[in-house]
Swiss-Prot record:
It is an enzyme of class 2 (transferase). GO terms for biological process: pantothenate biosynthetic process. It comes from the Bacteria. Keywords: Cytoplasm, Magnesium, Metal-binding, Pantothenate biosynthesis, Transferase. Pathway: Cofactor biosynthesis; (R)-pantothenate biosynthesis; (R)-pantoate from 3-methyl-2-oxobutanoate: step 1/2. Binds 1 Mg(2+) ion per subunit. One of its GO terms (cellular component) is cytoplasm. This is 3-methyl-2-oxobutanoate hydroxymethyltransferase 1. It is found in: Cytoplasm. The lineage of its organism: Bacteria, Pseudomonadati, Pseudomonadota, Gammaproteobacteria, Oceanospirillales. Mg(2+) binds at D49, D88, E120.
Amino acid sequence: MSTHVDRKRITIPQIRSMKGKGSIVSLTAYTTPMAQMMDEFVDLIIVGDSTGMVAYGFNSTMSVTLDMMINHGAAVTRGVSKACVIVDMPFGSFQESPQQAYRNAARVLVETQAQGVKMEGGAELLETVDFLVRRGIPVMPHIGLTPQHANVQGGFKAQIRTEEEINAFIKLGRAFEEAGAFALLVEGAFEEAARKVTAAVTIPTVGIGASPECDGQVLVTEDILGLFSGYTPKFAKRYVDLSQPIKEAFSRYAHEVRSGEFPAMEHCFGVRKNSDGG
């Protein structure tokens, strides 16, 4: 069994200071083993509400609960000794009021030991971000394509196309910076919009389906590992196809159990070895 080693983790101020100094490397994680494996390679781990679709088979993120996010967030921080960890606030846990958002975000930080929260939305969140930051809770607003607003946005479609929309997007990014956000997650925005908002703010932008000009990139880990055999989003890159070796392992295990090959005596307790080592 592995044990967590408490070392110096990357801090929120350090993430903020990485603006313009090389790309911030970020991935999603929902479990301790995955967090342990990626920890040495990434700067920022996002415990995303995408877990609803990745781990639970939901059609969207709307069914994810605060308790689910806390459980996954705590699992991830137990596996991390270097990376900064941010936890998504799920739909319905922060939209009602700044006070509701504070209560739930404070619970997330206390119970998970994560370093900040991520919230999806637009100008309606400005007051909430200011309220939380003033009370010691680091916030990363998630702008552009926001999956929690898929019903309003008409599905998972790229956003911010026109000049008017781009100008409003830049204004929104600056407003979040003024409200105290430490970084912005920019998803599914047209490249020009993502590039221009990155240039317009002094806090880092982390892109997913956005622009190479963002200050960092994040992808869903299961997408880069090829764990979904049927679909890879346009903005994702599959670095390995693990679905096939995993299926092969399942196949070999099933065959050995059915054939009686597994377990062998070497896998059993209380069995003495023969004098010849057999």
